[in-house]
């Protein structure tokens, strides 16, 4: 019977947006980063918010390469630094957190019943790239991020919009930081410094939610 129910459920449409939501929440961690511009005396001249976008790192590298081809190309590409980009780079099953697959629990308020099978644990891998023209700008951004991950930062989210009582904790771990400055031109012609921060997030993917309220006993008379 459990096996039969599994095959039936494979034909049931559902979309819980777990990966999409995780990507959005991850990006929101870094959407309020600023750098300060100061004079030689340390007086703040301006504060610049660092733009953040979801995009593959390689697309920014291509645009930075175009910028190095002269002022006309730089105006055409129109990319301003510093800035950041992030992307999801992996979705991997995590067997160490797997609970019995056929377990179900009631995910509905009192008086209703919606059965939800145990979630399947996955590790989502992300990378965040920081692009800057100066080392000081790049380090201002990096040092506003790293201290919050020691090496883990936990996010609390509601995985189902129609089931607000369910809350999931998503541990986000900083796994490494890489530095790249491979431009072979003069110091003045350097196109960009790039820091790449790598993260993992532990979450669960869920199947369809079965509404089984019809079989509930609403009232018992003695």
Model-identified regions with their sequence ranges:
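Acidic-leaning, charged glycine-interspersed low-complexity segments
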Residues: 118-120, 140, 149-209, 214-216
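Oligomerization/assembly interface segments of phage tail-like spikes and tubes
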Residues: 82-90, 118-134, 143-145, 191-204
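Extracellular/virion structural assembly segments
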Residues: 10-13, 17, 91-92, 113-123, ...
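Short, Lys/Arg-enriched N-terminal segments with co-localized hydrophobic residues
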Residues: 1-8
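Small/polar-rich, solvent-exposed N-terminal microdomains that initiate assembly or binding
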Residues: 9-102
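Conserved alpha/beta core surface patches that mediate binding of polyanionic ligands
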Residues: 99-113
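Catalytic micro-motifs at enzyme active sites that drive phosphoryl/nucleotidyl and oxygen chemistry
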Residues: 70-76, 110-118, 182-189
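Short, cationic low-complexity segments
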Residues: 108-111, 215-222
